[in-house]
Amino acid sequence: VLMLLALLVGCATSRPPQRYAWVTGLKADKAERYEYLHAHVWPDVNQMIKQCHIQNFSIHECNINGQLYLFAYLEYTGTNFDADMNKMAADPTTKNWWKQTDPCQTPLPDAAAKGKIWSDTKEVYFLP
């Protein structure tokens, strides 16, 4: 048993998670609804997020000159981000969740041009 444990520990790769962040607008008249939904996230939505190798997921709200924005951050620990995101997008509960949350959001022009809600960001600094 000790030998097997040593082999498992030796074979385990300890790669750091990949960090992702996005930004989108939040409709002022839907902000309360959006906050309510996220204060009461459906358990199956959280479970799917975890099944897709996502950890430390957070969404922050910011008011800039009267316009509301959402900033989302997550860490991905899997090996195929696109496949996991496709898995999440195909999940019926997640689709229904997005039908609730998407109308609260206002995509920025770059995301809207691609038919997306969230705009990609580029990491410019990280302190481990």
Question: How would you describe each model-predicted region?
Answer:
Residues 67-74:
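A generic structural motif
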Residues 19-25:
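Active-site-flanking beta-strand signature of metal-NTP-handling nucleotidyl enzymes
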Residues 17-19, 37, 71:
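Short catalytic/metal-binding and nucleic-acid-binding patches
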Residues 48-55, 75-119:
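An amphipathic, aromatic/His-enriched active-site/gating alpha helix that lines ligand/cofactor pockets
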Residues 30-55:
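Short amphipathic alpha-helical segments
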Residues 60-64:
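Short beta-strand micro-motifs enriched in acidic
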Residues 1-8:
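Sec-dependent N-terminal signal peptides
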